[in-house]
Every structure is written in structure tokens, then in C-alpha cells.
């Protein structure tokens, strides 16, 4: 920690301002701006997020209280709440979306060699969604049930570093599986998801990338076994099978070989059946990689706090 400088100023040292400036120039964000630049808006909202502010008035009050200390972070003067409200409403959101992608690319490089607990050469991602409840009185456009409002946040979480590779916000009634088609697939990567994403046509698209998917098999899965590998019962593996889909319509969507791995969780006693197109990874590593999917649940808890 550096004496004499605020924590906020030291955190902002890691923000690549040149990248932010490029995003602002790309969309003309600072044209005809009198007082609150895009970067000052970004700093004010970072301060609000990091300190848990709950309203524009709360942000304004706290910034006025600590304003002089934030001068060296780049925030020359605390913005009035009306100015900040106008900026949040009218500024081009693509400035901050593009900058977010630049930060994600930077984080990806930093965590490229982060251990996963399994031997894996490529990237690994967890795909899931969560519904964020909204007050219908304040957000009447977010209605999705008779008395409830909300949005659904679909997230692809990089398991090396546990940060989001992308986030897509949709109406709450959009089904999870529709987002599989939005994936820009990375060759050699692993995509881990729960059984709500089972779509064999999309799985075949992942297989042809070529990339890997890992999910829980649905209970009514019709599977034709062709080969069984020895199962390591000491590590909770009940069976390790390769085969094809038995149901004709499903096999038409996914005609290639699949692998089915049975696992008993020693901590909870639960029995799980995994489905993947990876036929070489040890079965115990398949189970361990699926356990890492829990990181996205922790990420959602953090977001909702």
C-alpha cells in the first residue's frame, strides 16, 4: 500500500486509460460535454460500486465527503446527482461495453496459466443464468409474472480466474438454451453447463468447432452403449461409457460418439451422470471439472449482494 494515496487511486492505476480513451473516441462520447467526461463518469460509478452506494444522492453525498482524496484518481470534482443521472441515461452504452471487453481480454491473459485442478490445455468456461428480481412499480417494463418483475443475466464465466467472459441480459422469460446459439466458440475450449442447456444440435455445433461440452445428462436420455472403460470406484466413478444417442431424432441432430460418465459425490452422496464429447480426459477429471461449475453460482451470489 502506498502512503498518501487513496485505495481508489491505486486501484485505478490498473485501469488502461488509453483503452478507455479509444472507446470514447470510437463513439464520440465526449463531444459537446461541458463538465462530466466519460472517464469521470466511469470513476464516479466505480466508486459507487466499490463502496456499495445505493442511490445517486448517496453517491453525490459520499463523493463530496471524500472528493479531495479522489483528485489523484482522476476525478477532479464530484458531479451533481442530476449531471450523473443525465450521463447514465444518455451516454452511449457501447463505450463501457467495449471497455469491459478490453478488461476481460486483459484478465484472460493474466489468468491464462491459472490452475484448474485438472490437466487441461485449453480454456474452460461455465455457462449459466440467474434471474435478477426488479420492482414492478419502478420497472413496469420488466414484468414476467403476474406480480413479479425481473431480468435474466446469462453469463459465460472463465474458470481460470473466475471472471465473466461475456454477459447477456435478456427478458426473464427467455429460456437458457437459446443462448447457446450466441456462443462464439473457441477451438479447444471446454464449456460446462447444467442440464437446462441440453440441445443436441447446438452440442454438435460445439463438437465441430472443435471444442468440448460437459453437462449433466437428463434422466430420460436414451443412450446406446458401445464400449465401457474400467471405472475407478475409489474416486467415485460408477461407470464410463461411450456410445451414441438411441432416439432417432436426437441422433439426427448429434450423430457422433458421446461419452457418459456416472459419478457418486462422496460429500453429498448424490449420483450424477455427465455427458460430454471428450473421450480422452480421465473420468475423475470430468467429474472434477463439473464441480468447478459451482464457481458461477458463487459469482451470481456476489452480483446479487
PLM feature spans:
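Single, function-defining residue in the core of a domain
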Residues: 1-58, 62, 91, 98-106, ...
Amino acid at each position: 500500500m502506498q502512503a498518501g494515496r487513496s485505495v481508489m487511486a491505486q486501484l485505478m492505476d490498473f485501469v488502461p486509460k488509453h483503452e478507455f480513451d479509444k472507446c470514447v473516441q470510437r463513439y464520440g462520447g465526449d463531444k459537446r460535454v461541458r463538465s462530466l467526461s466519460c472517464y469521470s463518469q466511469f470513476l464516479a460509478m466505480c466508486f459507487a460500486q466499490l463502496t456499495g452506494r445505493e442511490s445517486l444522492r448517496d453517491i453525490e453525498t459520499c463523493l463530496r465527503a471524500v472528493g479531495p482524496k479522489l483528485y489523484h484518481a482522476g476525478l477532479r470534482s464530484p458531479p451533481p446527482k442530476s449531471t450523473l443521472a443525465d450521463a447514465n441515461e444518455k451516454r452511449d452504452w457501447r463505450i463501457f461495453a467495449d471497455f469491459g471487453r478490453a478488461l476481460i481480454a486483459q484478465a484472460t491473459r493474466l489468468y491464462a496459466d491459472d490452475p484448474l485442478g485438472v490437466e487441461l490445455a485449453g480454456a474452460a468456461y461455465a455457462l449459466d443464468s440467474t434471474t435478477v428480481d426488479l420492482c414492478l412499480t419502478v420497472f413496469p417494463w420488466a414484468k414476467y409474472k403476474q406480480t413479479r418483475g425481473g431480468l435474466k443475466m446469462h453469463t459465460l464465466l472463465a474458470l481460470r480466474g473466475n471472471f465473466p467472459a461475456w454477459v447477456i441480459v435478456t427478458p426473464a422469460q427467455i429460456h437458457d438454451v437459446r443462448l447457446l446459439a450466441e456462443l462464439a466458440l473457441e477451438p479447444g475450449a471446454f464449456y460446462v453447463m447444467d442440464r437446462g442447456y441440453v440441445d443436441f444440435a447446438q452440442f454438435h455445433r460445439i463438437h465441430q468447432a472443435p471444442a468440448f461440452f460437459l453437462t449433466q445428462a437428463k434422466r430420460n436420455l436414451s443412450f446406446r452403449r458401445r464400449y465401457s472403460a474400467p471405472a475407478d470406484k475409489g474416486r467415485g466413478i460408477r461407470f464410463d461409457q461411450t456410445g451414441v444417442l438411441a432416439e432417432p431424432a436426437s441422433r439426427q441432430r448429434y450423430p457422433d460418439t458421446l461419452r457418459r460418465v456416472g459419478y457418486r459425490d462422496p460429500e453429498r452422496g448424490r449420483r450424477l451422470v455427465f455427458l460430454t464429447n471428450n473421450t480422452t480426459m480421465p473420468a475423475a477429471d470430468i467429474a472434477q471439472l463439473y464441480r468447478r461449475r459451482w464457481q458461477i453460482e458463487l459469482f451470481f451470489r456476489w452480483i446479487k449482494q
